[in-house]
Amino acid sequence: MARLFSPRPPPSEDLFYETYYSLSQQYPLLLLLLGIVLCALAALLAVAWASGRELTSDPSFLTTVLCALGGFSLLLGLASREQRLQRWTRPLSGLVWVALLALGHAFLFTGGVVSAWDQVSYFLFVIFTAYAMLPLGMRDAAVAGLASSLSHLLVLGLYLGPQPDSRPALLPQLAANAVLFLCGNVAGVYHKALMERALRATFREALSSLHSRRRLDTEKKHQEHLLLSILPAYLAREMKAEIMARLQAGQGSRPESTNNFHSLYVKRHQGVSVLYADIVGFTRLASECSPKELVLMLNELFGKFDQIAKEHECMRIKILGDCYYCVSGLPLSLPDHAINCVRMGLDMCRAIRKLRAATGVDINMRVGVHSGSVLCGVIGLQKWQYDVWSHDVTLANHMEAGGVPGRVHITGATLALLAGAYAVEDAGMEHRDPYLRELGEPTYLVIDPRAEEEDEKGTAGGLLSSLEGLKMRPSLLMTRYLESWGAAKPFAHLSHGDSPVSTSTPLPEKTLASFSTQWSLDRSRTPRGLDDELDTGDAKFFQVIEQLNSQKQWKQSKDFNPLTLYFREKEMEKEYRLSAIPAFKYYEACTFLVFLSNFIIQMLVTNRPPALAITYSITFLLFLLILFVCFSEDLMRCVLKGPKMLHWLPALSGLVATRPGLRIALGTATILLVFAMAITSLFFFPTSSDCPFQAPNVSSMISNLSWELPGSLPLISVPYSMHCCTLGFLSCSLFLHMSFELKLLLLLLWLAASCSLFLHSHAWLSECLIVRLYLGPLDSRPGVLKEPKLMGAISFFIFFFTLLVLARQNEYYCRLDFLWKKKLRQEREETETMENLTRLLLENVLPAHVAPQFIGQNRRNEDLYHQSYECVCVLFASVPDFKEFYSESNINHEGLECLRLLNEIIADFDELLSKPKFSGVEKIKTIGSTYMAATGLNATSGQDAQQDAERSCSHLGTMVEFAVALGSKLDVINKHSFNNFRLRVGLNHGPVVAGVIGAQKPQYDIWGNTVNVASRMESTGVLGKIQVTEETAWALQSLGYTCYSRGVIKVKGKGQLCTYFLNTDLTRTGPPSATLG
C-alpha cells in the first residue's frame, strides 16, 4: 500500500509517462465526467417537470441546478483545451472536485426534509470518480475520496444529531453510510491501482517496442551494409532469401531444393573490363613489418584503391595478398568501361609513385587490363565473395603478370574501346608470360601524359624524404606516410552512432525534454516545427505516443474496429479472447468485499429477518467456494504438507486463469450474486393487503388516506437497498478484463431490473417512506431530490453511463496492451532473426571468433583488427583439371554450366565445415578452382607459446583429415558427373598475420611467408597428392602420419626446397615412419 500512495519519482521517463497519461486517459475522462454531470443536471430538470412539479414552486432547487449548469459548463470550457489542462492539471481537477462536493451539499438541504440517506449515491459517485476519472495522483485521489466521505458524515451527523426524532436511527444509518463510502474508496483505489498498473505496463511495452523497432532498423541497416559489402545490390535480394532459408532450416544447412544442385547465383555480362594490379616489391617490405604495420599498410593502400575505383566507376572484386583486381561495367553496363579501368590503373600507378617519392621505399605497381565478357556472382555456401570467371578474366590476370612496373598493360580489345583517348606503345614482351606468348596477340603499354611532370616535381621531395628516412625502417616510414591517407576502418559503421539500442536503453534527455515542451504547446500547430527539432527516432516516439492516446479509439484504426474494438484480424481476436488473466482472482476478491459491504449495510438498516440471514449464509458459502477455486494455488503454497489426494487443487486456479469460458461463468455468477443480494431485503418486507400505494389499489389511493402504516415496517432500508444496487453497479467495473459486450449486457440487465423494482413493483415502498417522513397527503410531497425512487433511478442511469464509459476505455487499454505485447514479441523475434542474419553475414566475411570484435561490444574504431599467430596450418587445394574442363560455348551457355559444376564442388567442400570435427577449420577464400583454408586461427594470442610444440601443432592433423575429406567429396562428385577431377593439395604451417582490411568491402585474410609457401606447395604439387614442406612433414610425423620425400624442387621466389608427400592411404600410426629423415 505504501507504494500506492508514495509520491512519484521525478525521472524524466516518469515525466514522459505523466504526460502520456494525461493525454491518453485523463483528458477524455475528465471531459466525459463533466458531460455526464451536465446531462444529469438537465435530467433533474426534466424529471421534475415530467413528474408534474412546478419548477417555480421550488426556487432553491431551480437556482441550485441552474447555477450548477452554468458552473460546470464553464469548467467544461476550461478543460476543453488540452494544453491548458496539462499546465493546470491539479488546480483544475481540484476545482472540479470542489464543485461536485459543493453541489452535493447543496442537494442535501434542497427540496424537503434532510435524512441520513440523502445523496449517499451522489457522494459515492463523487468518491469513485475522484479515483477513476479525475486527473489526480493516487494520494490526491485518496484525500479527495476520504474528504468527500467525511464531509457527508460530519455534516449530517452535526445537523441531525441534535434532533430527537432522528436520533434513534441516526447511528446505524451513519454507520451504513460509512461502510458504503469505505467500499467506494476501496473500489476506487483498486480500480485506479489496476488501471495505472495496466497503463504503465502498456507504456513500457510501447517504449520497449520503440527500442526494439530502433534496434530492428539498426540491424536491418547493418545486415544491408554487410550484404552489400559482399555482393552487388542486384544479387543481394536473392542471397538474403537464401540466408533466411538457411536460418529457418538450421544454421549451416541448406534448404531443401526441388533439384539435386545447390543454388547458383552467377550471371553472364558482356562489355566489361577487368583490371588486375600487383604491388611489386611488397613481399620484401611485408617481411620487415610488424603485424600492426602490415595490416595498417594494406588497409591504407587498398582503401586508397577503393576510393580510386569509386571515382572511376569500378568495382573491386577481391584482394589476393597484395594483388588487387576490379571490373568496370558491373553490375550496370557502362559504355566507357575500358576508359574507366585504364584511368584507374594510371591513378593507382600515380599513387604508388607519390608514395615511393615521399618515402623512398622501392615499391611499384604493375597493372593489366583486358576487356570482354565475364561470368559474375558467388559460389559455395560459406565466405561468399563476389567474383568473376571467364577466359577474359584469365587473360587480364596474365596481362598483369606480363606487364611492366609502373605501367598499365592492355590488350588489343581494350585498345579498340579506348578510341584514341590515350597514346600507347607496343609492349613487345609476350616472352615474359607463357600464356601471352601462346596467345600470340600484340599487347600495349598506355602512356601516362602526366608521368613526366610528376617525376620532375617529385625528385627533390623523394631525395629529401629518403635522407630523413635513413634513421627509420622503410616499413615504419611507409606506415607513417600511409596514415595520412586516412582510409576508413573496416565495419566503422558498426562501432558507433547506429549501434543497436537495447530494450533497456533510456530515451535521450533531448527527446524527453522536447516531449514535455512540445506537448505543452498547442497541438493544433503544424508538426513541421516538431519534426525540425527531432531526429527520426524521436519522431517515431511521438507517433507511438499518439497511438497510445485513448481518443484514437474513436478514430479510424488499422488494428481495431472503431465501433466494437474487435481486432480486425480474426486470429488476433481469437488469441486475445483465449489469453490468460492471472489477476482474475483479485477481481473476485474485491467483488467479495462489495458483497460483504452490502451484507453489513443490510444488517445495520433492516430488522434482520431470519430468511435474509439464511439467504446471505448460502450466498456467502457460494462466494467462499468461488474464492477457494480462484486461490487454491496460493492456499496450497501456505500448506507445505498436505494429503496427496489434494495435490490437484492448484490446477483449479490455473484453469480459471487460462480458460475464458470458466472465467466468464464465474465472473457473471459473482456479479449476479452481488446484484441479487442487494435487493433481497425488498422481498422480506411485511406488507398489508390494503396498502393504498400497491398497484391494485392505486385507484383508491386518494380516498384511503386514513390507512395507517405498520409501525414495524423498516422503510428506512428502502433507500439503502438502492445504494446497495449502486454498489452492485460498481462490482462490474472491478473486472477489468471482462469483455465490453458482457459488461454492457450485465449493466443493462441490472439497470432494467433496478428501475423495474423501484419504479414499478416496489414503488409503493418509496411512497410509504414519503408519507411517513412528511406525515401528510401526497399533494405535499417533497422535491425531486428527496424522492427516493426518482433519485434512485437517476443514480442508476448516472452510474450506468459512467461505468459504460470506463468499461469501454478499460476494454481499449486491455486490447492495446495485448496488441503492444504481441507487436513487441514479433519485433523481438524479427530482431533476433535480423541479429542472426547479421551474425551469419558477418561470419561470411569474418571467422566466428573475429566477428565479436566488430559487433556487439561497441568496439572503439581507432585500431584495425590484427592478430599474429605462431603456428597456423594453411591449405591450398585446387582442381587443376577444371581449367581444361572449362569452356565457353553455346552448349554450356558460355561457361555457365561449367561454373555450376564448380559451384557444386566448392559447396560440397563448404558442407564439410559444418561438421564438428572440422570446427577448427576456417575457410579463407576461393581463387578460381582453388580452395584456401587454415587451422589454428581460433587460438588466443600467446597461447601457442604457453603450450608444448606437439600440442600447439595438433590442429595440423585436423587439416590433413580435412584435405582427405575434400578428396573424398571430389570422388563423389566425379562419380555423379562422370568426370575424373583430381585434387592437388599444398600444406604448410608456421607463423602468420591475420587481419581485416578494406572499408568498402571488408575482407579477412592472412599473410606471411607461411601462406606464400603453402601456395607454392600447391602450385608445384602433383595431382592426387598432398605436398608439404620439410618442417611440416616433421610435425605431421610427430602426430603419427607418414610422409615420404619428393626431393629438392625449384620454388618460385624461394629457391630450392626439399618437399614431401603425405601418405594419405595411411591413418595415424604409433611409431614414426622411417621414410622421413
From Swiss-Prot:
Catalyzes the formation of the signaling molecule cAMP in response to G-protein signaling. The protein contains two modules with six transmembrane helices each; both are required for catalytic activity. Isolated N-terminal or C-terminal modules have no catalytic activity, but when they are brought together, enzyme activity is restored. The active site is at the interface of the two modules. The modification Phosphoserine is found at residue 520. ATP binds at residues 278-283, 320-322, 366, 925, 1005-1007, 1012-1016, 1052. Activated by forskolin. Insensitive to calcium/calmodulin. Stimulated by GNAS and by the G-protein beta and gamma subunit complex. InterPro entries: A/G_cyclase, A/G_cyclase_CS, AC_N, Adcy, Adcy_conserved_dom, Nucleotide_cyclase. Binds 2 magnesium ions per subunit. Is also active with manganese (in vitro). It comes from Homo sapiens (Human). It comes from the Eukaryota. Glycans are attached at residues 697, 704. Coiled coil: none annotated. Mg(2+) 1 binds at residues 278, 322. The chain crosses the membrane at residues 29-50, 61-80, 94-117, 120-138, 141-162, 170-190, 586-607, 611-633, 664-687, 715-736, 744-764, 791-807. Its EC number is 4.6.1.1. This is Adenylate cyclase type 4. It catalyses: ATP = 3',5'-cyclic AMP + diphosphate. Detected in the zona glomerulosa and the zona fasciculata in the adrenal gland (at protein level). One of its GO terms (biological process) is cAMP biosynthetic process. Its cofactor is Mg(2+); Mn(2+). Residues 688-714 are extracellular. Residues 1-28, 191-585, 808-1077 are cytoplasmic.
